[in-house]
Amino acid sequence: MDVGRHPQITLLAYSEIEDISGYIGNFHIKVRKKVRYVDEVECTACDECVEVCPVVVPKEHQLGLAARKAIYIPFPQAVPAAYLIDIEACLGFNPIACGKCLEKCDKKCIDFDDQDKTIEFDVGSIIVATGMDVYDPTEFDEYGYTRFENVLTSMEFEILSGPGGVTTGEVIRPTDRKVPKSIGFIQCVGSRCESRGSPYCSNICCMNTIKDTLLLKEYYHDIDCKVFYIDIRAFGKGFEDFYRRSKALGVEYIRGIPGDIREDPKTKNLILTVENTTNGEIEEHELDMVVLSVGLVPRYDASTIQRLLTLSTTSDGFLMEVHPKLSPIDAPTSGVFFAGCCEAPKDIKDSVTQASGAAARALTILSQDKVKIQALTATVDEDLCKFCGICADVCPYGAITVDIKAKIPAKVIEAACKGCGTCA
């Protein structure tokens, strides 16, 4: 919200980047500001339009656990605090078959004839902070996520247990709406596995589960919590103490990942079969609810940013930095920097730290009149150039332009060229 109020920050909410061109110190950005059908300046979020809207659809922000109307604010504390219309769900568009929100709005903020807008501007540097997605457990469904109602993901449990969630913070079972007496947490769902999901550790899952167990024990003292894990990775400042507090409150940590989950057809309880690797025994645990601690994966549209900025990705799909130790914030494209989980899975603390570093790196460019570049750059012999465009296609930095139709020889943008020799 501070960003929305800052006089020197322009916030383009509900927008998508369509094109990026240029180079360090001289990037040109084209943004499509998607139509809201509601004037975000005039709208006061009075809620009267929502009251008369007859359409009810699942609420994306709460993963479908709650409902919203066709006219809605995407999530609490959204900036700007103005409504928008889901035109695919709305009944009042082309032709107007409903129009109740239009009639109810006294300030006449709603305009069904509104259109997308294209905004273009120039910037000196770019910080990529696109975030991440969470692993979809339906991919293999080995833990019965699509078959058993009492199997939830960690994201769904977060919504269920949060004060702003569908139950205002009360943890209940989906099947009978009762507070569970026992909950099991299965770690590394979609992480640390070559055959199912991703081979890497998602960094945040262990501590997120430990936090959930502490909250459960704080509000439900007699609840039985069991955590099934491969390894507990409590490596950060204060993390080990957090882990020990959880164990001291009676949370049981079982070293082993369940190989099978069954549901009791009468009670809807879940029966987990697991090999406890600390004693080598096969155990069965009957639980009221199971939470899948799902891992982090690259955003579904990460390839778009990769293409627009001519970036590379690692084998796991996250954006690749110049050097993991010496330049962990810099992208191979000069003037572009990374912040947060676009580069690798990380928690809030590490994301904030990297974002601060990215802001500082961007300021080093903006505070200078001229930018130092590498002396070694490619050159084009215009007499020999055949205007084929192959050099421009293979350049990993987008540093070469060529007009094939007009037969204009290739030109190297020295500010973007790294002298790698790929074009040669």
Describe each model-derived feature in a short phrase:
Residues 1-424:
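Residues forming the flavin
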